[in-house]
Amino acid sequence: MSAVPEYFGSLVFDDRVMKAKLPYDVYVSLKKTMYEGGTLDTAVANAVADAMKEWAVEKGATHYTHWFQPLTGSTAEKHDSFITPSPDGGVIMEFSGKELIRGEPDASSFPSGGLRATFEARGYTAWDPTSHAFIKDKTLCIPTAFCSYGGEALDKKTPLLRSMQALNKQTLRCLLYTSPSP
């Protein structure tokens, strides 16, 4: 049996894994996005997706999912495969930055109890890089926020992220107002 320190966190794409798997400039850009917000450059997103896929496949994963907590009170997942059949009968392992960052353009397939018609249920998942991806049951789970195309929160994470952003902004404003001038 393995010792706990050997396997604890071994299925999490955390800072240790990012440092080991990502080129330095990609790692720095990703960390900047995590701390300051904003969008990832396409090249950075592709490099992160490739490193994440390679790491997940090394750990036995064949699929990935955009994982989130909708307002139904449970978790929801949209599964896709890294595997694409090739013309010669083999397989191609693919996972792009676009697939990492954004998922499911049609929210009607998620657990909503059939409350909306398909044309009314437009929503999408967006990767939250501040939460680490992890592997569960040979599936790479990518933590995401779930929003409507109009920007309304359709999950429990989006309001939390927005609250953290608002608190950070106002705290910095108060600190600037109350701190002595140099």
Predicted regions and their residues:
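Conserved small/polar residues in nucleotide/adenosyl-binding loops
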Residues: 177-182
